UniProtKB/Swiss-Prot annotation:
It comes from Spiroplasma virus SpV1-C74. GO terms for cellular component: host cell membrane; membrane. It is found in: Host membrane. This is Uncharacterized protein ORF2. Belongs to the plectrovirus ORF2 family. Keywords: Host membrane, Membrane, Transmembrane, Transmembrane helix.
Length: 337
């Protein structure tokens, strides 16, 4: 029943965006009623072509949605790698809704406007911690901005601090967990997670709905093109070749290889999913810092000339200059004097 509701909801979403084309098809049908001979058959053929295209596009997006859901479900550890603005958090939010087809245990480390999604922190996955429980079987764990928790560029230092997470990383399959971690670069993800991840998801492009005032019926979904890999090595090879082709002025290849577990496809993400999260929810951290500042004044550059050289140096807070420009001790202060 859940799959039927999910299919029907997305099907209607696409159909609504194609209402304009349906009106055009209706217009062609009305015109064909007043035509005979060759003109009639041409209009009839256009209607048939449009209907086949419309039906294929609906089924195409639905199959891709199920392909992504099954891919995540089959991989205990997955990473989402993409530059800023490619829709990593949007994709996590989309999965927070679509993975409900298979489980009710959804956890995230960022706020979602969903009563069925539970709060999760890194301590839930730490076996040296005795304050927060590990999620139960068939849990989907959505972990955004993983670099804020573990510095992937310093794996040896982090291993000492986060050694309690290693048992969970290794045993995630035994716990029947499905976890996804996001980062802008693969090197930002902790090596222990990156090397054991059997699912690599790469958002390639994101077509956003066009913001319009008033009635906005035809632009209510995102279209995301992505690639999925089952091995980090395959992804790195594809990335290297893509960079080489781009440097030569060629387009990067997005060719699927089922044998290697490499697929490229598009999904649609309803606008209502994007409204379930705030992409700037961590801005409260700025307030924590500013609350402890005594002098909150900001200077204009036109005011700098009114300050003394010493005040400017203190204001700019350039440590190297402050260290090397310390006043020397005056002569004559030695013991001989």
């Amino acid at each position: 029943m859940k799959k039927f509701i999910f299919f029907f909801k997305n099907y209607c979403y696409i159909s609504g965006s194609m209402l304009l084309f349906s009106l055009i098809d209706l217009l062609l049908w009305i015109i064909s009623l007043y035509c005979v001979g060759l003109v009639f058959w041409i209009l009839f053929a256009l209607q048939c072509v449009y209907f086949v295209w419309w039906l294929w596009k609906n089924i195409f997006y639905q199959l891709n949605a199920f392909r992504l859901v099954n891919f995540v479900w089959d991989n205990p550890l997955s990473v989402i790698i993409g530059k800023l603005g490619t829709g990593k958090t949007l994709l996590l939010t989309y999965l927070s809704q679509t993975m409900k087809l298979l489980t009710d245990e959804i956890y995230s480390n960022y706020p979602l406007e969903d009563d069925k999604v539970k709060v999760l922190t890194f301590k839930n996955l730490d076996f040296t911690d005795r304050t927060k429980p590990v999620p139960p079987d068939d849990s989907v764990i959505l972990f955004d901005e993983s670099y804020l928790y573990i510095d992937g560029t310093s794996p040896h230092d982090e291993k000492k601090v986060h050694s309690g997470k290693i048992p969970w990383i290794v045993l995630a399959r035994h716990f029947r967990h499905r976890a996804l971690f996001t980062a802008q670069r693969e090197g930002m993800i902790w090596n222990n997670i990156r090397q054991l991840a059997s699912g690599i998801i790469i958002p390639i492009s994101l077509k956003k709905p066009v913001a319009k005032k008033g009635f906005n019926f035809f632009n209510r979904f995102f279209i995301m093109r992505m690639g999925i890999f089952q091995d980090i090595t395959d992804y790195e090879i594809w990335k290297t070749k893509s960079v080489e082709r781009t440097a030569e002025g060629k387009r990067a290849k997005h060719k699927s290889d089922v044998g290697l577990g490499i697929r490229f496809f598009k999904i649609i993400i309803p606008l209502e999913f994007a409204n379930k999260y705030d992409s700037e929810w961590l801005k409260f951290v700025r307030d924590l810092k500013n609350d402890e500042i005594v002098n909150e004044k900001f200077y204009y550059w036109s005011e700098i000339t009114k300050l003394s050289v010493k005040e400017r140096l203190e204001l700019f807070d350039i440590d190297i200059l402050k260290k090397n420009l310390k006043p020397r001790k005056e002569k004559g202060n030695g013991k001989d004097d």
